[in-house]
Amino acid sequence: MSVLAVIPARYGSTRFPGKPLAMIAGQMMIERVWRIAAAVPGVDRVVVATDDQRIMDAVAAAGGEAVMTDPDCRNGTERALDAVKRLNSDADIVINVQGDAPLIPPWVIGGVAETLRADPSLQMATPAIALPPETEARMRADKANGSASGTTVVFNKAMDAMYFSKNVIPFRRKPDEGAPTYQHIGLYGYRRDTLEGLVALEPTPFELTESLEQLRALENGIPIRVVLTDYRGRSAWSVDAPEDAVRVEGIIAAEGELV
C-alpha cells in the first residue's frame, strides 16, 4: 500500500509573501518540512506542490522533488489532488502535510499513515493532541479576545471526529471537570478516491462558517479518524508571519533539530 506525502506551498501570502522560502536556522522552511516528511518510515514519496518557479527551483536545489500545480487552486486540499494527478501517481494513501509547519514531528505524520495502512476501511485520518489545563486556559483566553488561531476537535468512542471548531470545544460547565480538550493538528491522510470525491463536493455551511475545510467531509458523511499523538516534549509552532520564523528559530536552538 503506497503512501505519497504532498506538501502544498503557495508563494503568495498576505502576511508573509514568499513564506516557503523563508530561512529558518540555515534552511528554507519548505526544505525543513520536506526533510521531515522524507524521514517518515513508510512514506514512499514526498513532493512539494507549488504554484511558483522559485519554489520549484529551491526545492530541486535542496535535493527534493516538486511539481507545478494550478495557480487557481483554492486551498491545500485542491493543490494536493492536482499534484497527485500531474504526477500520475498510483499512491493508495495521500498525506497532506502543511508547508508552514517546520516543527511537525515525523512520528505524527507516520501515525496518520500507519492508521490508514492498518485499516483499509478508513477513508480519512488526522492527528490531535490532548491539551494540558494551562494550555487550554490560555487558548480559551485568546479566543475570548477574538483569536482565530487553533482548532479543537471532539470525537466519539470509535475515535471518529464529530466536529471541529475554531472555538474551544467542549464547553465546560464545571471548569475543572470532564473530558480533555483536544487540539487538532492540520495534517490529513486520505484514500486516493476519498480525496478526489472530497474536492468534487461543494463547500458546506459549517465549512464556510468556521472556515475549516475538514467540515466538508463531516457534513457529507465522510468519517475522519482522529489519531491521538503527542509532541514528546517538543514545541509546536506554525509560521504565519515573519515573527513566527524568528520564534521557530529560537525553538530549534533550544530543542535541536527534528531530523
Curated annotation (Swiss-Prot):
**Which protein is depicted?**
3-deoxy-manno-octulosonate cytidylyltransferase
Recorded catalytic activity of this chain's protein: 3-deoxy-alpha-D-manno-oct-2-ulosonate + CTP = CMP-3-deoxy-beta-D-manno-octulosonate + diphosphate
Which InterPro entries does the entry mention? Cytidylyl_trans, KdsB, Nucleotide-diphossugar_trans
Originating organism: Maricaulis maris (strain MCS10) (Caulobacter maris)
Location of this chain's protein in the cell: Cytoplasm
Task: State any single GO MF term.
Answer: 3-deoxy-manno-octulosonate cytidylyltransferase activity
Instruction: Quote the EC number.
Output: 2.7.7.38
Principal subcellular localisation of the protein? cytoplasm
Q: Broadest EC class?
A: transferase
**Pathway(s) served:** Nucleotide-sugar biosynthesis; CMP-3-deoxy-D-manno-octulosonate biosynthesis; CMP-3-deoxy-D-manno-octulosonate from 3-deoxy-D-manno-octulosonate and CTP: step 1/1; Bacterial outer membrane biogenesis; lipopolysaccharide biosynthesis
CC terms in the record's Gene Ontology section: cytosol
Provide the family line: Belongs to the KdsB family.
Instruction: Mention one GO biological process in which this protein takes part, according to its record.
Output: CMP-keto-3-deoxy-D-manno-octulosonic acid biosynthetic process
Q: Which HAMAP family match?
A: KdsB
Q: Which keywords annotate this record?
A: Cytoplasm, Lipopolysaccharide biosynthesis, Nucleotidyltransferase, Transferase
Q: Does the keyword Lipoprotein apply?
A: no
CDD domains reported for this sequence: CMP-KDO-Synthetase (cd02517)
Role according to the record = Activates KDO (a required 8-carbon sugar) for incorporation into bacterial lipopolysaccharide in Gram-negative bacteria.
